[in-house]
């Protein structure tokens, strides 16, 4: 991919959608780009689409193209822990400019 906005988690095989992107948020832009995706996967046994999931992907721009370098799939439990921990750190002033003095 040459353009950050064109990066997707969607995947098809022989015209069948196996991974469907439901949304994305570009967290960082530049030579290293981080994107949070919301997606769902097709269950190969039933053929039905599964429940929504979340994934964090990091891409590196090299020779004008973005290549996936890291991938973290977040379970519901991991997502809740991540949210609550970040919220706690923000509430306690442990992130951002105020945290530099601590």
Task: Label the model's feature ranges.
Residues 1-102:
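Positively charged, low-complexity terminal tracts
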């Amino acid at each position: 991919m040459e353009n950050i906005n064109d990066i997707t988690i969607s995947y098809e095989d022989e015209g069948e959608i196996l991974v469907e992107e439901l949304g994305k948020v570009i967290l960082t832009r530049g030579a290293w780009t981080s994107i949070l995706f919301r997606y769902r996967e097709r269950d190969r046994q039933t053929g039905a689409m599964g429940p929504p999931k979340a994934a964090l992907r990091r891409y590196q721009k090299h020779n004008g193209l973005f290549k996936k370098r890291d991938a973290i799939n977040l379970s519901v439990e991991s997502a809740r822990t991540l949210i609550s921990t970040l919220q706690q750190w923000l509430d306690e002033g442990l992130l951002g400019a105020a945290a530099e003095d601590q």
